[in-house]
Amino acid sequence: MAAGLGVKAAPFTYVAHALAVAAAVMVLVWCISFRGGLAFEADNKNLIFNVHPVLMLIGYIILGSEAIMIYKIFPKLNHDTTKLIHLILHAIAIVLGAVGIYCAFKFHNESGIANLYSLHSWLGIGTISLYGIQWIFGFVAFFYPGAAPHVRRGALPWHVLFGLFVYVLTLATAELGLLEKLTFLQSSGLDKYGAEAFLVNFTGLVVALFGAAVVVAAVAPAHVEEPEGYAPIPVN
């Protein structure tokens, strides 16, 4: 669709990067200035939880988004080099996401809170599992040992489509997480119209816009001819 409308990827990568910086700053301001800081070990267990949204947004979503857009950010770069960067960024995103999830479990366990009772937690485990499966498939099919060329050509559109599905599911999970945490805080007395509440809500809006820009950048053509073996999803 983006290609059919004559939309190029480059402007959306610029918008995505600006929104990524904004989202990263907002989540850091929230967790450090409003929530007291970050820690892996602390008497104040909330500091352990604060690591969770920071790593999930900056480490998991933003780095994963960079991996998705890398073919459009550097369209003239050697395809094998771009593919390696794509693979490494996704791997780092998965690791940081796993650490972020660990911090949520650690906070719950040390605070006497049950685990895996909410839709956010179910989707969180589901999405990072799908993300890992997607990464393994991509590694085996497109990197090492690598499938036959005709198999790669047939698998690529599905790899891209499934990757974007997992990405959108990840964004939805993040939005649910922000909503869930803000609801808990407001039920504990946080001002519904206070600065912190507005910051969290605006963070959610920025993340949504960021995700939209990334998806458009992923499906739109680059401003130069696509490298061999990679093209935007065809839309008939």
From Swiss-Prot:
Residues in the Extracellular compartment per record: 33-53, 106-122, 175-196
Binding residues for heme b 2: H86, H159
Residues reported to bind monodehydro-L-ascorbate radical: L116, Y117, S118, L119, H120, S121, W122, L123, G124, I125
Residues annotated as transmembrane: 12-32, 54-74, 85-105, 123-143, 154-174, 197-217
First-level EC class: oxidoreductase
Membrane-side (Cytoplasmic) residue stretches: 1-11, 75-84, 144-153, 218-236
Binding site for heme b 1: H52, H120
Compartments where found: Membrane
Cytochrome b561 domain ranges (all copies): 15-219
Record EC number: 1.-.-.-
Recorded topology in the membrane: Multi-pass membrane protein
Top-level taxon: Eukaryota
Pfam family membership, one: Cytochrom_B561
Cofactor(s) listed in the protein's UniProt record: heme b
Keywords (A to Z) from UniProt: Electron transport, Heme, Iron, Membrane, Metal-binding, Oxidoreductase, Transmembrane, Transmembrane helix, Transport
Cofactor: record remark: Binds 2 heme b groups non-covalently.
One Gene Ontology molecular-function label: metal ion binding
A cellular component annotation (GO) from this entry: membrane
Residues at which L-ascorbate binds: A67, I68, M69, I70, Y71, K72, I73, F74, P75
Task performed by this protein: Two-heme-containing cytochrome. Catalyzes ascorbate-dependent trans-membrane electron transfer by utilizing a concerted H(+)/e(-) transfer mechanism.
Protein name from the UniProt record: Probable ascorbate-specific transmembrane electron transporter 2
Species of origin: Oryza sativa subsp. japonica
